[in-house]
Amino acid sequence: IKTKQEIMVRKISFIGVGPGDPDLLTIKALKKIESADVIFWADSLIPEKIINFSLESSEKIKTSTLTLEKITSIMIEKFNEGKTVIRLHDGDPCLYGAVKEQIEILKQKDIESEVIPGVSAFQVAAACHQAELTIPDITQTIILTRAGGRTGMPEKESLKDLAKHKSSLCLYLSARHIKSSQKTLLEFYPPETKVIVGYRAVSYTHLR
């Protein structure tokens, strides 16, 4: 049952759908997908079986070829038509999802939004290998970062600087930098340190 406040305030929802396994969707994410009028989804990252939960009548808009500006423009247009609009993000929207930029654009149009979290790749990788990321007397810290590339890294956030902490280190968007990352990490971590590599980790079979 919706509260009066929920009925009065319409929002655009940014929804994390996890790694692509339908069984790992949150209940809230599933309900949103099942009831949405318009669904934006990255067809290059999110499997169609996630979209299959939606209404047959819902409009599905693929975003893989659209710019962020174009996506938000269409979202605003559909929202102003009185439709329930959601955008699906692989993993969790708050990790490398450009969600802040989208929310700021919506705010300029006085449109409310919400973020619904999803299971992230580092959690799937750890669960697959039954790996605890915070072990007493070894590390109580998890660092989520990337190995550089086209997007520059802030000062003091180079892989070398972060590796000095010898914490559990999760590198996103870094498949092309495995060799250079390995060389850097071996300066600070012992050679026998356990490493999990995942690529398009939709299911456990994509991890080793």
Regions found by a protein language model. Name each.
Residues 121-133:
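Structured adenosyl-cofactor binding patch, chiefly the S-adenosyl-L-methionine
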Residues 131-145:
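Short, glycine-/small-residue-rich phosphate/pyrophosphate-handling segment
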Residues 15-16, 87-89, 145-146, 172-173, ...:
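Short beta-strand segments
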Residues 141-156:
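A short, charged helix-loop
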Residues 156-194:
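Conserved anion/nucleotide-ligand pocket segment
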Residues 1-7:
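Short, Lys/Arg-enriched N-terminal segments with co-localized hydrophobic residues
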Residues 205-206:
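Conserved small/polar residues in nucleotide/adenosyl-binding loops
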Residues 7-116, 124:
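Class I S-adenosyl-L-methionine
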